[in-house]
Structures are given as C-alpha cells and as structure tokens.
C-alpha cells in the first residue's frame, strides 16, 4: 500500500436534529431524518518510511509534523487528527505508525452540514482500509462519535457520524447507552429528484462553532418550553418521513417551517437578524419555508420552493453576501480505495 483515499458525504439535516444529543435521547429517545448530498470531505493517507507523522489540512491553513510515537498530545493544532490516531494505535495497532494525512472539504468549516464528524469518519475509514481493520458502518460511526464527543469533549449529537457512514436517506433512532438504529429509506428516484427540484441550498457566509450552540441548547433543556419544542421536533422527523414516502411536498414544506420555529424556541442563538432577513427574502421570492442545516446561527440554509419560482429565488439570493450551492442527493456513504 502506498496511498489510500476516502470520499465522505456531508448531510442535510431534514428533521429531528438536536434530539440525537445524549442529554435528550438518553431519557426520551431521539428521532432524526437526514440525507447525504454530493458535497464531500476528501482524505488521502500515504504510508511513510521515515518515522514521521504529517497532518495537512490546506483548507484550514493547518500543517503539523511530528516524530512517530504511540501517543500525540493535544496542543490546539489539528487535535481532531491526533485523537483519531491515538485511538487507532490504542485500540488496534498497539504500536506507532508513520504516514502523511491530507484532507480538505468542499465547503467551509462551521457550515452546518456535519463537517467535523464527517471528517472523523473519513479518516477512520482511511486507517481501516490501510490496516485492514474489521470495521463496518456501525463500528466506524460509533468510534467516530466516541473520539469527537468523549475523547475530545466536543458537545454534539450522533446523527452526523451515522449519516456519513451509511449514506442516503436515513431515519435514525437514538436510545440511551449510545444505542443507535439506522433505518435506510428506499426513496423512489423520482421523489428524490423532485425534492432536489424544490430545494435551494444557500451558504449564508456566516460560520459558527456548532459546539457553542449545542452547549447553549443543553443548558436550555431544563426549560419546559424548550423541552416541549424538542419533543415537537422529534415528532416532525416521523411526520416528514411519512410525507416523504407519500411524495407530499406541501406537508414537507409545512413541517420544515414548523421545525425552524421550534428550533428557535429551544435556543434564541440559533438565529439572528441576518438569518431572519435572509429567511424573509426567501419567502418574499417564492420559498414556502426553510431552516438552517445543523446547529444553526449561520452556515447553510435550505429552502423549499415551487420549481417554477426557483430561478427567481436563486437570483435574489445571489445578490446577497453568500452563495447558492448546487447539490444532489447521494445514495452512498463513505468510500475508500487504494492506488
């Protein structure tokens, strides 16, 4: 083996986001509906013979070089890479490795498409391919969750890791003790195509740290109104799944708008004046409804719109500071290959 590559899809959170956080799902059970899209985290892993470890993330202007050893301490520089390496050595190889790891994303960090978790999945998959580790979808996702949420202590849920490994449209169930059931949905091709025709994905040019927003949400779950809103969001995931199977796009749009309102009840920091202005602009130009993807407060927003009015909405959004992002829904999760 000289080179391993992986391509890992990002995801759109359609409904139920936030109910996959352990503080909620351990007690109430969480339901999430999401779908992977044709935007990716790209990873290349190259075996070295000189006893060096190199981490290279050009899209974040980050580069680190170390002597190979069994444990790399966190120092604020690409700690997520080091934590993955530490777990691979601890759990599998029991000895240090020498390699170069290069990654980049199709979208900016803090975009709300599950980028950090998708990155972890892609890197784990690269190591699994290199070392012939017997890791299936559930094992990769669970390991990615443990690295990000437990080893690094980054607050957040589990949907992103499972979306990245399984790919496609999925209805996910989250229970206590990190138990997750992923239900792949057999959505007809024409329904997925129509959903694409009715969706506009817009990057607001506002990036944010999801962990800060999720931390704020955690503190609000003791509030009765916030908890009721979380319960409502969970039910929205069930209702949206059913509407998707029926190709009931009107109901899909209604649920999306309702979920956005509930999301703002849970935490007031998920929106701001600029996002509200963009939302109103979208509605004024033909959108039925919309919401942010992910934790909120910035990143990508997506809107449901009548396809005959889609161009007008795109034209209006292109006059703003962000950009409209083309995409399609994908059926595959993380994939790897050797060259």
UniProtKB/Swiss-Prot annotation:
Residues binding substrate, per UniProt: 17-20
Keyword Metal-binding listed: yes
Gene name as annotated: hddA
One Gene Ontology term of the molecular function aspect: ATP binding
A GO CC term assigned to this protein in UniProt: cytosol
Site keyed Transition state stabilizer: positions: 11
Residues holding Mg(2+): 116, 148
Keyword annotations from UniProtKB, A to Z: ATP-binding, Capsule biogenesis/degradation, Carbohydrate metabolism, Kinase, Magnesium, Metal-binding, Nucleotide-binding, Transferase
Native organism: Campylobacter jejuni subsp. jejuni serotype O:2 (strain ATCC 700819 / NCTC 11168)
Active site: 160 (proton acceptor)
Family annotation (InterPro entries): GHMP_kinase_C_dom, GHMP_kinase_C_sf, GHMP_kinase_N_dom, HddA/FKP, Heptose_7-P_kinase, Ribosomal_Su5_D2-typ_SF
Disulfide bonds: none
Coiled coil: none
Catalytic activity line of the entry: D-glycero-alpha-D-manno-heptose 7-phosphate + ATP = D-glycero-alpha-D-manno-heptose 1,7-bisphosphate + ADP + H(+)
Organism domain of life: Bacteria
Pathway assigned to this chain's UniProt record: Nucleotide-sugar biosynthesis; GDP-D-glycero-alpha-D-manno-heptose biosynthesis; GDP-D-glycero-alpha-D-manno-heptose from D-glycero-alpha-D-manno-heptose 7-phosphate: step 1/3; Capsule biogenesis; capsule polysaccharide biosynthesis
Annotated protein name in UniProt: D-glycero-alpha-D-manno-heptose 7-phosphate kinase
Pfam families according to UniProt: GHMP_kinases_C, GHMP_kinases_N
Gene3D superfamilies, per the entry: 3.30.230.120
Enzyme Commission identifier(s): 2.7.1.168
Stretch forming the signal peptide: none
Family note: Belongs to the GHMP kinase family.
GO biological process: capsule polysaccharide biosynthetic process; D-glycero-D-manno-heptose 7-phosphate metabolic process; galactose metabolic process; nucleotide-sugar biosynthetic process
Positions annotated to bind ATP: 57, 110-116
């Amino acid at each position: 083996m000289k080179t391993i590559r992986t391509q890992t899809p990002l995801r759109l959170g359609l409904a139920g986001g936030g109910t996959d956080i352990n503080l909620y799902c351990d007690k109430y059970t969480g339901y999430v509906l999401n779908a992977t899209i044709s935007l990716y985290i790209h990873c290349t892993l190259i075996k070295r013979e000189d006893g060096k470890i190199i981490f290279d993330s050009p899209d974040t202007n980050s580069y680190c070089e170390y002597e190979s050893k069994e444990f790399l301490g966190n120092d604020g520089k690409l700690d997520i890479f080091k934590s993955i390496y530490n777990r691979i050595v601890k759990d599998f190889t029991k000895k240090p490795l020498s390699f170069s790891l290069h990654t980049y994303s199709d979208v900016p960090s803090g975009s709300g498409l599950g980028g950090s978790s998708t990155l972890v999945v892609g890197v784990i998959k690269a190591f699994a391919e290199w070392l012939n580790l017997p890791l299936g979808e559930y094992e990769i996702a669970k390991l990615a969750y443990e690295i990000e949420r437990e080893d690094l202590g980054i607050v957040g849920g589990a949907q992103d890791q499972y979306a990245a490994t399984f790919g496609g449209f999925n209805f996910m169930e989250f229970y206590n003790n990190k138990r997750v059931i992923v239900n792949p949905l057999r959505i007809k091709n024409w329904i997925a195509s129509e959903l694409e025709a009715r969706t506009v994905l817009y990057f607001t040019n506002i990036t944010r740290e999801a962990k800060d927003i999720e931390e704020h949400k955690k503190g609000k779950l003791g509030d009765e109104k916030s908890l009721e809103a979380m319960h409502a969001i969970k039910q929205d995931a069930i209702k949206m799944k059913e509407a998707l199977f029926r190709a009931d796009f009107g109901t899909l749009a209604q649920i999306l708008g309702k979920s956005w309102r509930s999301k703002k009840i849970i935490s007031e920091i998920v929106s701001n004046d600029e996002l509200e202005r963009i939302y109103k602009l979208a509605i004024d130009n033909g959108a039925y409804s919309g919401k942010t993807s992910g934790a909120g407060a910035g990143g990508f927003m997506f809107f449901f719109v009548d396809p005959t009015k889609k161009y007008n909405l795109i034209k209006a959004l292109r006059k703003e500071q962000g950009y409209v992002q083309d995409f399609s829904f994908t059926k595959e999760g993380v994939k790897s290959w050797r060259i």
